[in-house]
């Protein structure tokens, strides 16, 4: 007797067996349908839906976008691509010469206005925050991009992490991000309210936008980058909480998750299917604002680049970000990076 025939006979002779089969069927359906819907939603977000229209955020209406860490890499690309959409800019970074060059370039290329502020955010100075408030409180600001960030120089055990590096990571990634957001968010709320009450039909549905750069290092616990990983995980919960608070004020708050992108901080120089350059990554981010892409189960969160999104989706669905196997793989990966970095440092020391 075949297995199928045995099942048929059992189902005819046993009510309990039939109930069990129905239970298995319903349970499987309850698991499969949400999975299929999440997968289809990701596909539509990434490949089907049209790009976001930035008229709702005040492009070409004289509004400003504030970008921190604006002089290089991802921050510079955010500035350039927002300028191309018609936003005026406030550029905040450490190196004044780079800011001046970027200001001149974008004003000439896109016919927008750009203001700059050169400050060292790692100093966590009240004077710095007061400068931001006093210089820009009267501007019509509708977008804030919290891009400034710092990681470890190389993967390092937490117990061997230097105090200065640890403090700088927390100050730059967390304290400065929160302080700048506390200054700029009320200005965004005020700008949005003023536009919506102006009587201009084009501005009656105006919204504000706060983007904060997250990381897979915060999504997935990352041994040998423990302080950085924790700082980015903090931003996940903070940003999602802020999204709930500011929804009634018509301000969208999004945490932007990325895997590796070619940049000075990642120390990766070659692009690949999994590693875009800043221009490609920022383009995919601005295209998909307001959609989850790979972060289907995370409110106020977006994993915008297609290969990062699929990678995120697979980890969440098959393992879970806190799974031991994921932690072990992450540890081995960063341990190998540390070994290569230490060997390189030893070679360079001998040459000198």
Regions found by a protein language model. Name each.
Residues 145, 180-184, 188, 238-239:
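Hydrophobic positions on the long internal alpha-helix
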Residues 41-90, 94:
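Canonical Rossmann dinucleotide-binding motif of NAD(H)/NADP(H)-dependent dehydrogenases/reductases
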Residues 135, 150, 159-178, 235:
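Catalytic Tyr-X3-Lys loop
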Residues 189-234, 239-240, 244-247, 259-261:
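Catalytic loop of short-chain dehydrogenase/reductase
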Residues 237, 243-324:
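SDR active-site lid
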Residues 107-125:
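Rossmann-fold cofactor-recognition segment
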Residues 1-64, 190-193, 323-352:
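Non-catalytic terminal and boundary segments that flank Rossmann-like NAD(P)-dependent oxidoreductase
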Residues 68, 118, 141-150, 173, ...:
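Rossmann-fold scaffold of SDR-type NAD(P)-dependent oxidoreductases
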């Amino acid at each position: 007797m075949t297995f199928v025939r045995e099942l048929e006979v059992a189902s005819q002779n046993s009510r309990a067996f039939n109930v069990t089969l129905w239970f298995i069927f319903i349970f499987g359906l309850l698991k499969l349908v949400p999975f299929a819907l999440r997968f289809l939603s990701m596909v539509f977000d990434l490949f089907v839906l049209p790009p976001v229209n930035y008229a709702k955020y005040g492009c070409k209406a004289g509004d400003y976008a504030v970008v921190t860490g604006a002089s290089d890499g991802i921050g510079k690309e955010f500035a350039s691509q927002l300028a191309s959409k018609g936003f005026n800019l406030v550029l905040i970074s450490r190196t004044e010469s780079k800011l001046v060059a970027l200001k001149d370039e974008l004003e000439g290329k896109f016919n927008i206005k750009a203001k700059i502020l050169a400050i060292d955010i790692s100093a966590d100075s009240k004077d710095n925050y007061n400068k931001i408030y006093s210089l820009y409180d009267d501007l019509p600001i509708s977008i804030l991009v919290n891009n400034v960030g710092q990681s470890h120089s190389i993967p390092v055990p937490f117990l061997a992490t230097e105090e200065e590096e640890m403090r700088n990571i927390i100050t730059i990634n967390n304290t400065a991000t929160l302080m700048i957001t506390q200054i700029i968010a009320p200005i965004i709320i005020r700008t949005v309210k003023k536009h919506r009450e102006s009587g201009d039909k084009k501005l009656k549905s105006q919204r504000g936008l706060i983007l904060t750069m997250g990381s897979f290092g915060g999504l997935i616990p990352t041994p040998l980058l423990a302080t950085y990983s924790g700082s980015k995980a903090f931003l996940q919960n903070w940003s999602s909480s802020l999204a709930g608070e500011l929804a009634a004020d018509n301000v969208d708050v999004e945490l932007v998750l990325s895997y590796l992108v070619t940049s000075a901080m990642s120390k990766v120089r070659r692009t690949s299917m999994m590693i875009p350059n800043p221009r490609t990554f920022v383009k995919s981010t601005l295209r998909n604002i307001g959609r989850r892409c790979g972060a289907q189960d995370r409110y106020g969160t977006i994993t915008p680049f297609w290969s990062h999104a699929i990678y995120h989706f697979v980890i969440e669905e098959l393992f879970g970000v806190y799974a031991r196997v994921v932690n072990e793989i992450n540890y081995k990966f960063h341990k190998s990076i540390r070994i290569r970095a230490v060997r390189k440092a030893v070679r360079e020391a001998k040459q000198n």
